[in-house]
A protein has these predicted regions:
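Conserved blade-ending motifs and adjacent loop-strand segments that build the rim/top face
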Residues: 181-207
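A short beta-strand motif characteristic of beta-propeller blades
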Residues: 11-17, 66-78, 119-130, 184-192
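Loop/turn-rich, solvent-exposed surfaces of beta-rich toroidal or solenoidal domains
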Residues: 132-181
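Structural signature of eukaryotic scaffold interfaces centered on beta-propeller domains
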Residues: 23-36, 79-96, 138-143, 200-211
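Blade-loop segments of beta-propeller domains
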Residues: 4-42
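Beta-propeller blade signature
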Residues: 1-8, 50-62, 106-115, 162-180, ...
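Asp-box/WD-like beta-propeller blade repeats and closely related beta-sheet repeat scaffolds
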Residues: 49-90
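Short glycine/acidic-enriched loop and turn motifs that connect beta-strands
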Residues: 43-48, 101-105, 154-159, 218-223
Length: 233
């Protein structure tokens, strides 16, 4: 997994390789006095490529870190769970862990301090009530009382199941973190003319007016590019 740091204008200003950590569907970025700490899935299952644990690692530009490195702590808050992906609510100091148990997708929410101390007593343990049959999970975010969940696929051709003329099947669902109830679901209609247009990543940019940010992947001849759209959360 390669983590790339981008400037607001889209220029690459740093990168780090994480080997054996996982797929990287969602992750957290925690500012610290010494720089930036990354919350990522870790201990990838060799059969699937998805993480079986959560790690918190410092970002070090230009370096390579192995999941099996000595001294790296792998948090395993949910024994038996698979495909674990973390993200952070920096405002309220909470950790959200997306995970699967059997065929069921779920979320667990922890206080950051408790999680780091390996006190894995969740504030909330929530079955995903928003994910519909056949949908592809593409990321999640936690802010205040809501989980924001991104789903969707890249465009197919016009004869396929997700043609550009239909506007794509990208959706954001809002889940109440206390009750687990899905309280809203909206199709993302931004940039319908993008080539490929696969939804890949969602986050909340905190501030006096928080913004919900959604990334759409664009396939070009030599690489993929990313376009990010924001709206009021």
């Amino acid at each position: 997994m390669c983590l790339t740091v981008l400037s607001p204008s889209g220029d690459s200003v740093g990168h780090m390789y994480l080997r054996g950590f996982g797929h990287g569907i969602s992750f957290g970025v925690e500012p610290s006095d010494g720089g930036v700490l990354l919350w990522v899935e870790s201990d990838a299952d060799p059969r699937t490529g998805y993480g079986r644990a959560i790690a918190r690692v410092p970002f070090r530009d230009g370096t390579v870190l192995d999941s099996a490195s000595a001294g790296l702590r792998h948090h395993r808050p949910l024994p038996g769970a698979r495909r674990m992906h973390p993200t952070l609510d920096l405002t309220n100091r909470r950790v959200l862990v997306s995970h699967w148990v059997g065929r069921r997708h779920a979320y667990a929410v922890y206080r950051t301090e408790d999680f780091l101390a390996q006190r894995y007593e969740p504030l909330h343990n929530i079955a995903d009530t928003a994910l519909r049959k056949g949908e592809t999970f593409q990321g999640c975010a936690l802010h205040d009382e809501h989980i924001y969940q991104l789903t969707g696929n890249p465009y197919t051709d016009e004869a396929g199941e997700n043609p550009p003329s239909a506007g794509g099947n990208t959706f954001v669902s809002t889940i109440d973190v206390s009750s687990g109830r899905t309280v809203a679901r909206r199709r993302v209609t931004a940039a319908p003319g993008l080539r490929f247009r696969e939804p890949e990543g969602i986050a909340v940019r905190p501030g006096s007016t928080p913004e919900l940010c959604i990334a759409l992947s664009v396939k070009t001849r030599d690489r993929r590019k990313l376009t990010v759209y924001s709206c009021g959360s």
